[in-house]
Amino acid sequence: MLHALQWRKYMAEENNNEELRHLVRIMNTDLKGAKPVEYALTGLPGIGRRTAILIAKGAGVDPTATLGYLPDEEVAKLDAAIGKFEEIVPSWMLNRQKDLTTGQDKHLLGTDILLTFREDINNLKKVRAYRGLRHERGLKVRGQRTKSTGRRGSTVGVSRKK
């Protein structure tokens, strides 16, 4: 069993004695350099493991390689592959299909995904849709039971007879 120091030396020897970069900046986000590429890319909102593997393969980078040891050229390739992800994969794999305003299939990343999600909920509230009303009232939206679960606030005890 290798200790942490021995492991670091082994990894440095394997990667031509390059120093590990602990933070790698991709798409204006700091990603952990100690993780493999397929796990590190999941730090970006809108990218899961499956999409991370496809992005790495599309960029010609080994998904199991440690992100911090990759040279700058390969990190730039990853950044470019993330930008053209919509062209690489079929439309059913994108996270925003048939957008309400444009009707296009898109893959949202970063803060765009959060802003669009919030905008959709506000739109549902504005048109007074059932889902919008449930969101407004802070209740369950997808048809779950609410008789006994999903309660908030402090519990009210039952008073006993003397």
UniProtKB/Swiss-Prot annotation:
Q: Which cysteines are joined by disulfide bonds?
A: none
Alphabetical GO biological process terms? translation
Disordered, as annotated region: 142-162
Q: What Gene Ontology molecular function terms does this protein carry?
A: rRNA binding; structural constituent of ribosome
What keywords were assigned to this record?
Ribonucleoprotein, Ribosomal protein, RNA-binding, rRNA-binding
Domain of life from the UniProt record: Archaea
Of the GO CC terms on this record, one is: cytosol
Which Gene3D superfamilies does this chain map to? Answer: 1.10.8.50, 30s ribosomal protein s13, domain 2
Q: List where this protein forms a coiled coil.
A: none
Q: How does it assemble?
A: Part of the 30S ribosomal subunit. Forms a loose heterodimer with protein S19. Forms two bridges to the 50S subunit in the 70S ribosome.
The cross-references to NCBIfam families, in alphabetical order and at most eight, read: PRK04053.1, uS13_arch
Task performed by this protein: Located at the top of the head of the 30S subunit, it contacts several helices of the 16S rRNA. In the 70S ribosome it contacts the 23S rRNA (bridge B1a) and protein L5 of the 50S subunit (bridge B1b), connecting the 2 subunits; these bridges are implicated in subunit movement.
Record-stated family: Belongs to the universal ribosomal protein uS13 family.
Q: What is this protein called?
A: Small ribosomal subunit protein uS13
Tell me the organism: Methanosarcina mazei (strain ATCC BAA-159 / DSM 3647 / Goe1 / Go1 / JCM 11833 / OCM 88) (Methanosarcina frisia)
